[in-house]
Amino acid sequence: MNKRRRRLLAGVGTAGLASIAGCSSLDFIRGEEALGFEADPARVTDSAVAESGYTESRTDSDTIVREFSAAGQSREVEVTNQLAEYDRGITVFGQRFRGALFVVLSTPQVDLFDRTFNPVGEMDTDELIEMIQERYDEIGDVTREAERQAELLGESREVVTYRAEGEFLPTSLPVSLVDLTVHISEAVAVGDDFVLCVGIHPREIDDTDAIDSLLAGVEHQG
């Protein structure tokens, strides 16, 4: 995943800001504590990665500073999301590329004044894919295609697939715009965070079984 694509996925969880551990409303008003929200990592187990045929390509954190207002006061809030990225190669036009991608995002909830300010928990998958499009203009022509139930964090969750067109392959190829299948899970509240997963691959391959194996293997480390 390139830097831009990482920022896209990291940005999914930061539109409304994440969860503070141990910060009271009085702390916020007086400004007596630095406001820092950091999600715990979420990862796919080694056995699930091996079963899927994917490999772990990187784990990363993404920190964003936003101004946050409450009780008539405004302060800067530092939000840290955790990303885990997995991929596997495909062969196109006789050349091998990283063609299938699976990303796990853990983003803080931002619980303050008995409210959760991170909107991800209230978004459905249509809203999540719209947010992805806003942050990643190489994906377009998105159409909702199907829904299914898949295991994620120990329970059956809704996963929606979308048909899209995007610049997923290197532009040096004769065809750089390809039809894509995008899998998006609902956001799941776990601990003080929300966890959601995104899988992307060309439509010419069916990676649904592999995506479901990865989903079932996700563990939150909080």
Each model region followed by its residue ranges:
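Acidic, polar-rich N-terminal leader regions of halophilic archaeal proteins
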Residues: 2-222
